[in-house]
């Protein structure tokens, strides 16, 4: 079976977009994500996004990590999703809503020559309750807790912003450490549904550098929910102000923390290529 697709990226975090109508076999979405996202045997991407009609928003986004697991939200992905549905004419307004597993998100697109160049997303408010994240903890929140990994002590904080995110503030960022420790914490028994892991370096009151190990995807060049969570907890701890530029390996993202607690993320979304995937699941 042939499936039309478009490949896109948001600051280096790359995704495959397909229409639900072109592949309405929900029982195969998990396996399809594994296949198309494979860097050697598929198209290659961090995740698969499926565009579907919604009864509660302008459009629905179903998101699957490269390991086939479904996720409630993806910050860089939803920017690419917004560009896709706007550029394809599925929505015709610059402010619209997207249904996700973590709720309805409001987005605003900026256009150049009638094509989306950047997207601003209301990521919502951080959830601090360990039971909702979830974290195996009896406290009211899980902030600045100590965790031993391979004989080293790490101070970690975990929040829910669509998906679980664990934040570790470091003096310097070491990619080998990010990959080694990130994988261990992702699968730690503290987190019954696993967790994303963000290593953050405070540059100044308005700038943070972040590297992320994503749950279900591994190391990625960018993570929108991750940088939003980092800024949210950094602001909560008075480490940064309400407006932050986040430096990630794939570029930069702008984060604003509103007085009421909503976190806004703004950044680019770009097309890479489009084509036809020769799927092996459905003949």
Swiss-Prot record:
It is an enzyme of class 5 (isomerase). The record marks 165, 214 as: Could be important to modulate the pK values of the two catalytic cysteine residues. Pathway: Amino-acid biosynthesis; L-lysine biosynthesis via DAP pathway; DL-2,6-diaminopimelate from LL-2,6-diaminopimelate: step 1/1. GO terms for biological process: lysine biosynthetic process via diaminopimelate. GO terms for molecular function: diaminopimelate epimerase activity. It comes from the Bacteria. Pfam families: DAP_epimerase. Substrate binds at residues 13, 65, 75-76, 196, 214-215, 224-225. Belongs to the diaminopimelate epimerase family. Catalyzes the stereoinversion of LL-2,6-diaminopimelate (L,L-DAP) to meso-diaminopimelate (meso-DAP), a precursor of L-lysine and an essential component of the bacterial peptidoglycan. HAMAP family: DAP_epimerase (MF_00197). This is Diaminopimelate epimerase. It comes from Alkaliphilus metalliredigens (strain QYMF).
């Amino acid at each position: 079976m042939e499936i039309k697709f478009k490949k896109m990226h948001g600051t280096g975090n790359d995704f495959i977009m397909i229409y639900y109508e072109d592949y309405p076999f929900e029982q195969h979405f998990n396996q399809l994500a594994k296949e198309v996202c494979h860097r050697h045997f598929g198209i290659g991407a961090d995740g698969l996004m499926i565009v579907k009609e919604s009864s509660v928003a302008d459009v629905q986004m179903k998101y699957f990590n490269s390991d086939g697991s479904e996720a409630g939200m993806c910050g860089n992905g939803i920017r690419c999703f917004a560009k896709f549905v706007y550029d394809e004419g599925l929505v015709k307004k610059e402010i619209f809503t997207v249904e996700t597993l973590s709720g309805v998100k409001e987005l605003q697109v900026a256009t150049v020559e009638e094509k989306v160049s950047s997207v601003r997303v209301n990521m919502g408010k951080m959830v601090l309750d360990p039971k909702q994240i979830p974290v195996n903890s009896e406290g009211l929140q899980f902030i600045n807790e100590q965790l031993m990994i391979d004989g080293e002590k790490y101070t970690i904080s975990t929040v829910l912003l669509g998906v679980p995110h664990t934040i570790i503030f470091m003096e310097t960022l070491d990619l080998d450490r990010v990959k080694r420790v990130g994988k261990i914490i992702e699968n730690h028994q503290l987190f019954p549904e696993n967790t994303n892991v963000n290593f953050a370096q405070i540059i100044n009151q308005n700038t943070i550098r972040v590297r992320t190990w994503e749950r279900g995807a591994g190391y990625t060049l960018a993570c929108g929910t991750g940088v939003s969570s980092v800024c949210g907890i950094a602001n909560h701890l008075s480490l940064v102000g309400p407006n932050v530029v986040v430096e990630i390996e794939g570029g930069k993202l702008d984060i604003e923390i509103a007085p009421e607690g909503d976190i806004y993320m703004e950044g680019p979304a770009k097309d890479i290529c489009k084509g036809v995937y020769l799927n092996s699941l459905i003949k």
